[in-house]
A protein has these predicted regions:
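Helix-to-beta-strand junctions that scaffold the AdoMet/dcAdoMet cofactor pocket
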Residues: 153-154, 167-169
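Short, glycine-/aromatic-enriched active-site segment of Class I SAM-dependent methyltransferases
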Residues: 175-204, 209-214, 235-242
């Protein structure tokens, strides 16, 4: 097996396990640092179209919408200065939570989502297609987003290359991915977390360096790659104390805006936040 980014065959095996598939290993390239699964054979054709990402018993879309509402609002607030009177495409739009907020300001919103039941649910609320190739010829967008999608793609480079076809000359691409340098993995080395966080749907995990490499290989220009911490200190303390998720709910009394900002700023400074947010544009 070769590294997706640099074609090296020199891998180390990361500690931990893939939570839903014990046949897979987590490989880290010793040349460039990309983290990838040892195989992609478990993802069959039609996997995402048939709600395979959600397991054998997908939760109702209404429950899914409630669970993503906080992130949908965060992303809207993060990008709202870019939205007024702009044409927006959200690739892998999921339940459409971000787009439904974005259409308050944008001149038009479009979603790309392979999951059939979601398209049926959203078809009367927003314009939605199953793939980029289904867009009308000549379609152009001022903002293209992909939130926690790139890590699911077997060939993310080709998708980023496709984005270029639909991006307006002065447009922007914003992608958000989980970070392979998450402090729970690389600083605290939480063993329970190492057996919890890796997932068979996440084919790749990027750090700031490997994400920049992917962007450059796709012929795009990096405006910025930002460290962002989604989970607060209470979550991390709970993992370290109890070895379980949910600390941001059970121990929320520990959190305050000042404490969380100070903790997030510290993790950002050392490059070990749990999330990366990249702003991209076309090359000159």
């Amino acid at each position: 097996m070769q590294c997706y980014l640099c074609q090296s065959t020199d891998f180390s095996i990361r500690k931990g396990s893939v939570q839903d598939n014990d046949q897979l290993q987590i490989l880290e390239c010793q040349n460039c640092g990309l983290v990838q699964l040892s195989s992609q054979a478990h993802l069959q054709q039609g996997h995402y179209e048939n709600s395979g990402m959600h397991g054998a018993d997908p939760e109702p879309i209404e429950v899914w919408e409630r669970n993503t509402a906080e992130d949908d609002n965060r992303r809207f607030e993060m990008l709202k200065t870019l939205l007024p009177n702009q044409r927006v495409l959200d690739f892998g739009c999921g339940n459409g939570g971000f787009l439904k907020k974005a259409q308050e300001l944008a001149s038009g919103v479009t979603g790309i989502e392979p999951e059939r039941r979601v398209r049926e649910h959203l078809s009367e609320q927003i314009q939605i297609f199953s793939e980029l190739g289904a867009l009308r010829g000549g379609s152009s967008f001022d903002l293209i987003t992909a939130f926690h999608v790139v890590e699911h793609l077997s060939d993310p480079r080709s998708i980023l290359c496709e984005f270029k076809k639909y991006l307006a000359p002065d447009g922007r691409i914003v992608i958000e991915v989980p970070s392979s340098s998450d402090a729970l993995l690389t600083l605290y080395e939480s063993e329970p977390f190492q057996h919890f966080t890796y997932w068979s749907q996440h084919l790749y995990l990027f750090n700031a360096k490997t994400l920049e490499t992917l962007v450059q290989q796709s012929g795009l220009k990096v405006i910025s790659i930002q460290q962002y911490q989604r989970y607060p200190l209470s979550n991390h303390l709970y993992w370290l104390s109890k070895g379980k998720p949910g600390g941001h709910k059970f121990w929320s009394f520990l959190d305050s805006p000042l404490l969380q900002q100070a903790y997030a700023d510290t993790l950002s400074r050392i490059g070990q936040c749990d999330t990366l947010i990249a702003h991209l544009e076309l090359c000159d």
